[in-house]
Curated annotation (Swiss-Prot):
Protein name as catalogued: Geranylgeranyl pyrophosphate synthase penG
Pathway: Secondary metabolite biosynthesis
Binding site for Mg(2+) 3: 231
Species assigned in the record: Penicillium crustosum (Blue mold fungus)
Site residues, Important for determining product chain length: 139
Superkingdom of origin: Eukaryota
Positions annotated to bind dimethylallyl diphosphate: 116, 194-195, 228, 235, 245, 255
Length: 341
């Protein structure tokens, strides 16, 4: 039987068999004492570095696909106020983009998605197991970068942020898998965790490196809610979304998006929409019917009205922040972008 020492890293070689042979030869030749746990497990450890290129494959693939980068733009815009030094800002941006990309890798598996940004999802290319591993690796890769911020509080912020993100994701999956339509209030709470949580994690890391101590939680929470409701609306109404993710993908996923939630509650005695979600269908005829049904319950109109309401609240909060901190063209541009549909 072959024993591997604690801390042994599989080398960048073709097969596990090669690993076993090389390691066994090292032991046989006396280059490694199996009883000495402090010894190097191989005679030339520099030849056996972690195969990070392979491990990062799904992550790097998704990073290479162009996206909206709304989080990076938000960080740059907020920095008009925070004035975080460039080196620290770049670290924070890298942490956030890695976390966001890792969450997308997992989301696409959990949702059985086929397209991401108009291209095949990572797990269709690399496989489910390798993609999950790459996403998990990315979470810890982001965590390791916290050390470069030189502030012990960053780890607590990071941990709480990821716990919040996974709580939100867990509730959304629970509703979907058990065909439980949440209330509007439950949806907003979920979004505050899932979408707003990563936004706020970025803000908190920035404030560790800034003299600005103003509480941004309400404003960032509003941005997260607006972003997610808009995304749910666009999923069912936007031609652009059809090209990048597929036609009305939320229906195929069985997801309780904002317009769908309103439509179900608007006609509580009609189970048609619930039954369509249960099918998780790819049939465009059925999905087109579902979109017409959602339209018939006034849910798209309601969605636009709620977006306008949240946007007005966000703009009012933004004006208050400008009075305290000065103007921000970047934040104004983001709010204008979120108004477009």
């Amino acid at each position: 039987m072959l024993f591997l020492a604690p801390g042994y890293i599989f080398p960048n070689v073709a097969t596990p068999v090669t690993v076993a042979i090389d390691f066994a030869q090292a032991v046989k030749q006396g280059a490694y004492n199996v009883l000495d746990l402090k010894a190097s497990p191989i005679p030339n450890p520099e030849l056996f570095q972690p195969p990070s290129r392979i491990i990062r494959g799904p992550l790097n693939y998704l990073l290479s696909l162009p996206g909206k980068d709304i989080r990076g733009k938000l960080i740059d815009a907020l920095n008009e106020w925070f004035r975080v030094p460039e080196d620290k800002l770049n670290i924070i941006k890298e942490i956030v983009v890695i976390l966001h990309t890792a969450s997308l890798l997992i989301d696409d598996i959990q949702d059985s998605s086929e397209l991401r940004r108009g291209n095949p999802v990572a797990h269709r290319i690399f496989g489910v197991a390798q993609t999950i591993n790459s996403a998990n690796y990315a979470y810890f890769l982001a965590q390791a970068k916290l050390a470069d911020l030189n502030d012990s509080r960053a780890f607590d912020i990071f941990t709480k942020g990821l716990l919040k993100l996974h709580r939100g994701q867990g509730m959304e999956l629970y509703w979907r898998d058990n065909l439980i339509c949440p209330t509007e209030e439950e949806y907003v709470e979920m979004v505050s965790c899932k979408t707003g949580g990563l936004f706020y994690l970025a803000v908190q890391l920035m404030q560790l490196n800034s003299e600005v101590t103003v509480n941004f939680s309400n404003f960032i929470n509003l941005l997260g809610i607006i972003f997610q409701i808009r995304d749910d609306y666009m999923n069912l109404q936007s031609g652009t979304m059809t090209k990048t993710k597929g036609f009305s993908e939320d229906l195929t996923e069985g997801k309780f998006g904002y317009p769908i939630i309103h439509s179900i509650h608007a006609a509580p005695n009609d189970s048609q929409l619930i039954q369509i979600l249960k099918l998780k269908t790819k049939d465009e005829v059925i999905k087109q019917y579902a979109v017409r049904y959602i339209e018939s319950t006034g849910s798209f109109v309601y969605c636009r009205e709620k977006l306008d309401m949240y946007l007005e609240e966000a703009n009012e909060t933004f004006r208050g922040l400008e009075m305290l901190l000065g103007p921000s063209k970047g934040i104004r541009a983001i709010l204008d972008f979120l108004r477009t549909r």
